[in-house]
Amino acid sequence: MIREHFEFRQTITTILADDRGHIEAAKSGMLAARREVERQIAGDPYFSATLEPYTPNNPANVPASMARAAAEAGVGPMAAVAGAIARAGVEAMAGAGAAFGLVDNGGDIALVSNREVKIGIYAGASPLSGRFAFLIPPGEEILGICTSSATVGPSISFGTADAVTVFSPDVAAADAWATAICNRITADDTSVLDDLPKTGVLGVLAVIGDAVVRWGDLPPIVRARVDERLITAGSDWQYYGRS
């Protein structure tokens, strides 16, 4: 298996593939998706500024998918950008003939796989962090596995959860819902899960300190040791410890 770190401006990714050509396909797919998003922002700056649902006029495919997913989750379109770009990368890999391909865009993962894959659960200072992993079964369709955190990384969050991971066949939706849930969920208040759509979101795992909240259908969770060196991050990665 080939593992490659790929960065372009704000897009910071890890790509996994069996073939060098599939790595290059992923890069091309992500860059094409970025161009669509950049054109949208250039002509409509509000698209990138708002933290609320927003429907742009005549968007291209990628911005449109972001806006739809974000509107359903009640967040701004940019909450879905990492997932949308990751999906574009894996779609390009599959189009190039890949039976296995993974793009991790800063914790927002798109995956197509002909084998079992372990995805580690990293949750900052939680005592559960780095000790478990999801065991993802093989699947011919693209799967989104997106994680949001209020305590790890530079992304905007209004919550307290150490990690919220959402599974969905729509990677942009997984990304948007991870953000929305992370903004609101606490160990004592899980009412945000009542807002999840009846279809589209497969399962949710939230880690808040030493508390765990599960919703829907999740893949098996197994004991594992997460190697933090494999976490996809740029030079500005950081852990925000609680005071």
Swiss-Prot record:
Signal peptide: none annotated. It comes from Methanoculleus marisnigri (strain ATCC 35101 / DSM 1498 / JR1). This is UPF0280 protein Memar_1519. Coiled coil: none annotated. Belongs to the UPF0280 family. The lineage of its organism: Archaea, Methanobacteriati, Methanobacteriota, Stenosarchaea group, Methanomicrobia. Transmembrane segments: none annotated. It comes from the Archaea.
